[in-house]
């Protein structure tokens, strides 16, 4: 399944242009790293993809069909993990996953099986019943990603998922994401401003001041930079 962004632009005002004529195509079963400094337009792009704001111009297509923002169905094919935590720290990991599954309309039996599957995949058995507020940063990130996958999305979009993690947990997170691509068959867009995380992706998109400055395989970037 293909997810295409075509000539996307977004202006917050006449003087503030967050994204300028951005186009790319994402394929499932791949991890695409989106790299850019703070202010490059990455977070604005994620808000548009999540349906939180509308682009000023341009289109988003899924399998060649333009995404009508009045149709909520495409959002059901995407899982989002935002930079700022949105998980309930007072409730247990199990309760958070259960609530997310209920919002997605999963029946009790399917939800129970899915939670067990995700707990095993993310190795969360030792802490899944504890209040989220008592967990480490790495444990919370695993839980947030698991929650985004509760409904088996085709796409997983991650906005700065390694924020606040040390190098060991960053490496573990990268391993988990690649495992998910193989086991779940989903496509991943990994947004980051940390160059060390570039190798987490199969492909690379680079943004600067709202514009795309590179889109391709890492080997191509090395040739351009050499």
Indicate residue ranges for each PLM-predicted region.
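A short, flexible loop at the N-terminus of ABC-type nucleotide-binding domains that lies
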Residues: 1-5, 9-21, 70-71
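Helix-to-loop junction immediately C-terminal to a conserved catalytic motif
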Residues: 50
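Conserved ABC transporter NBD signature motif
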Residues: 58-69, 73-74
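Conserved ABC ATPase "signature" region
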Residues: 98, 102, 109-127
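Conserved ABC ATPase signature
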Residues: 131-135
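Conserved catalytic motifs of ABC-family nucleotide-binding domains
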Residues: 152
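Catalytic Walker B motif of ABC-type/P-loop ATPase nucleotide-binding domains
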Residues: 156-159
């Amino acid at each position: 399944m293909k997810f295409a962004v075509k000539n996307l632009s977004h202006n917050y005002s006449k003087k503030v242009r967050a994204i300028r004529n951005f186009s790319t195509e994402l394929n499932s079963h791949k991890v695409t790293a989106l790299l850019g400094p703070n202010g490059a337009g990455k977070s604005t792009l994620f808000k548009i993809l999540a349906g939180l704001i509308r682009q000023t111009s341009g289109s988003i297509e899924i399998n060649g069909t333009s995404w009508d923002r009045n149709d909520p169905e495409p959002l059901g094919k995407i899982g989002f993990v935002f930079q700022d935590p949105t998980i309930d720290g007072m409730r247990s990991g199990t309760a958070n996953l259960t609530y997310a599954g209920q919002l997605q309309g999963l029946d009790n039996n399917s939800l129970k099986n899915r939670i067990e599957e995700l707990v095993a995949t993310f190795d969360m058995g030792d802490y899944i019943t504890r209040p989220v507020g008592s967990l480490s940063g790495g444990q919370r990130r695993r839980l947030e990603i698991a929650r985004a996958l509760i409904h088996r999305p085709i796409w997983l979009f991650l906005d700065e998922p390694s924020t606040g993690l040390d190098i060991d947990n960053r490496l573990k997170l990268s391993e988990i994401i690649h495992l998910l691509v193989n086991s779940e068959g989903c496509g991943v867009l990994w947004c980051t401003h940390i160059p060390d995380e570039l190798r987490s992706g199969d492909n690379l998109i680079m943004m600067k001041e709202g514009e795309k400055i590179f889109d391709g395989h890492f080997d191509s970037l090395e040739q351009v930079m050499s």
